[in-house]
Amino acid sequence: MGAYLTLIYGVIVIAALVIIGLIKFIFAQDKGNEKMQQISDAIKEGAMAFLNRQYKTIASLALIVAVIIVVANYYGHLSEGSSQALSFALHVGFAFITGAFCSALSGYIGMYMAVNSNIRAAAGARSGLNRALQIALKGGAVTGLAVTALSLFGVATLFLAYGGLSGQDELIKEAPSLIVGFGFGASFVALFAQLGGGIYTKAADVGADLVGKVEAGIPEDDPRNPAVIADLVGDNVGDCAGRGADLFESTAAENIGAMILGVGLYPIFGWKGILFPLVARAIGIIASIIGIFFVNTKDESKDPMIALNKGYFVTTVVNLIALFFAVKVMLSGHLPDGRPVNYLLLYGAVVTGVILSYIFVFLTDYYTSVNKRPVQEIAKASTTGAATNIITGTSVGMESTALPVIFISAAIYIAYKLGEMAIPHIGTAGLYGTAIATMGMLSTTAYILAMDTFGPITDNAGGITEMSGAPEEIRRVTDRLDACGNTTKALTKGYAIGSAALATFLLFSAYLDEVKKILGKPIDSWFPVDIGKPEVFIGAFIGAMIVYLFSSTAIRAVGKAAQYVILEVRRQFREIPGIMEGTAKPDYARAVDIVTKGALKEMVIPGLIVVVTPILVGVILGKEAAAAFLMIGTISGVILALYLNNGGGAWDNAKKFIELGNYGGKGSDAHKASVVGDTVGDPFKDTAGPSLHVLIKLISTITLVFVALFR
């Protein structure tokens, strides 16, 4: 085990050193003129103020939940003896606090780097496209590497502390079950970070657009708009802090779920089957570092997306090569009858996961790109009014769920069968195959997250150049990067929901394993869920309902918070003379403060609904009903998230397609109709949709933590 631990912690150290180097590179860059710095400072101040207040709210809720976890697990394990029950409960409670802290820290790092990179990317645009591209991507890379390294460090350290280093088989096998609290803590913070950030960003965006662009007739990012700084702050709190916590949770949950499944194969692989997910994560970090340094564009006229795709391709190739050797060395055990495990089939599961990630990126691009049929259909429908825009956009969103579901299903089936063929006649072999496929898909997480954070950095850079009155040639550079950033944000949402779907299949399987352990059944036996029982049917019904109820409250929260912003912007236009003439400065801080309070107030109820419901289902209706709740909740959540993400993205880009000069261009009736569709789609793609990625993993980790209480 020593050599593998050296590899894991060695990679964490390398990631830390690279992060330090990237931070030094970014902070050494020029910060532009005084006006640019003033705008950047206002964005930074607003973003960090929101994050600090949000984390105070989350921390108070997390402490209450930690106490409930300890008490629930103590009483749930009392049959094993008082001292053993207390030890188990404290281990799970501490893991929850650790996961919550690491998730919050990853969000903080993402936010801090974004608000310090945006001004430097804007200033770098004066030296050309490549300089600005390098600054923005490396700012995003700090987030990507920090999130994945923190996740790896947290899971690995807890595993070792909870028995992984003991040398005793029973303690090593028990350790993954004790660290499920880490996944729940990560999920808990991620839900509120994504939800609160999503409400903030869309409330500010909708408020700024409706009063600024529609009522006052001023352009986007115009310094006369009192909500413009709040809008730029929103780009960071939703896409940096929120997505950072989301993918931190995905990697942590996938690692823990795969480690629990590895316990079932202990007679064949020993501790290597449990440790393999951590080694795979370490390999992914190194591959992402290599890919990041391959990104550059010597030809300034080329689409910067080509350079980013090159880095993604390099990351994938390095991953595939390194994971082949990892599978060969770690998963080449022997079956009970003496035959060797076919590691090539297990490697096939890795390739399946990698291919699925590419397919998801391609499908998301197809349904949200201005160059493709779906978006152009919505743009054409806008020529006959807002109603036909909404009807066509809804249709596109619904259509966009079909192919992703088919490919997810195919990937799960193929990976499951490859696992069964590689390790025949072992009950959990197929599930381990799907775990390996999930590792393949998530192996590029650090690079994907770098691309995602690249989006808000370039968006802010464009806003800063616009508000500071920078020359037209600099704005052209930042506009090209901003367009590229919009693409990366859309693509990473597709990647996030695909990885969430695979990760939750693992967690569902891990839940069934935990139930078998509690019932004293062999780990390779079956836990039957009788769909004919009314409790099971009711649990499934509630699982489907909770997804829609949560989305409803999240979307409504955006509407309520946006009303606060709209009223404030109207008040300032009315009461502060000279704003429209440019002779008086709007009160940006007031608008930021109002949307901050509104977002934090509105995020609590949707979040609590998700946390409480699965516990009540398990306690009142039982373990089988909780399993049905998980399965149907996951299926409904994935499909609805695809609809919301892709539908919202398509509405957004239909507006951009018209703004390029099609169907009358800006100011035309078609453009006005497309603005309505874009406004409807905003809370879909940036609030409810991304929050569902977290929800489907959260309900799985909650049931894992509280399963001992279920009847």
From Swiss-Prot:
Catalytic activity: diphosphate + H2O + H(+)(in) = 2 phosphate + 2 H(+)(out)
E.C. designation(s): 7.1.3.1
Cofactor(s) demanded: Mg(2+)
One Pfam family of this chain: H_PPase
Determinant of potassium independence, annotated site positions: 489
UniProt enzyme class: translocase
Positions of the record's site feature: Important for ion transport: 239, 246, 686, 697
Coiled-coil region: none
Subcellular location: Cell membrane
Ligand binding (Ca(2+)): 652, 678, 682
Transmembrane segment boundaries: 7-27, 58-78, 85-105, 145-165, 179-199, 251-271, 274-294, 311-331, 343-363, 403-423, 431-451, 495-515, 535-555, 602-622, 624-644, 690-710
GO molecular function list: diphosphate hydrolysis-driven proton transmembrane transporter activity; inorganic diphosphate phosphatase activity; magnesium ion binding
Residues reported to bind Mg(2+) 1: 205, 209
Its membrane topology: Multi-pass membrane protein
Keywords for the protein's UniProt record, in alphabetical order: Calcium, Cell membrane, Hydrogen ion transport, Ion transport, Magnesium, Membrane, Metal-binding, Translocase, Transmembrane, Transmembrane helix, Transport
Principal location: membrane
Entry GO terms, CC: plasma membrane
Source organism, top-level taxon: Bacteria
Binding site residues for Mg(2+) 2: 235, 459
Residues bound to substrate: 202, 685
Function: Proton pump that utilizes the energy of pyrophosphate hydrolysis as the driving force for proton movement across the membrane. Generates a proton motive force.
HAMAP family: PPase_energized_pump
Family membership: Belongs to the H(+)-translocating pyrophosphatase (TC 3.A.10) family. K(+)-insensitive subfamily.
PANTHER family cross-referenced by the UniProt entry: K(+)-INSENSITIVE PYROPHOSPHATE-ENERGIZED PROTON PUMP
Description of how the protein assembles with itself and partners: Homodimer.
Protein name as it appears in the record: K(+)-insensitive pyrophosphate-energized proton pump
UniProt organism field: Caldanaerobacter subterraneus subsp. tengcongensis (strain DSM 15242 / JCM 11007 / NBRC 100824 / MB4) (Thermoanaerobacter tengcongensis)
Lineage, highest ranks first: Bacteria, Bacillati, Bacillota, Clostridia, Thermoanaerobacterales
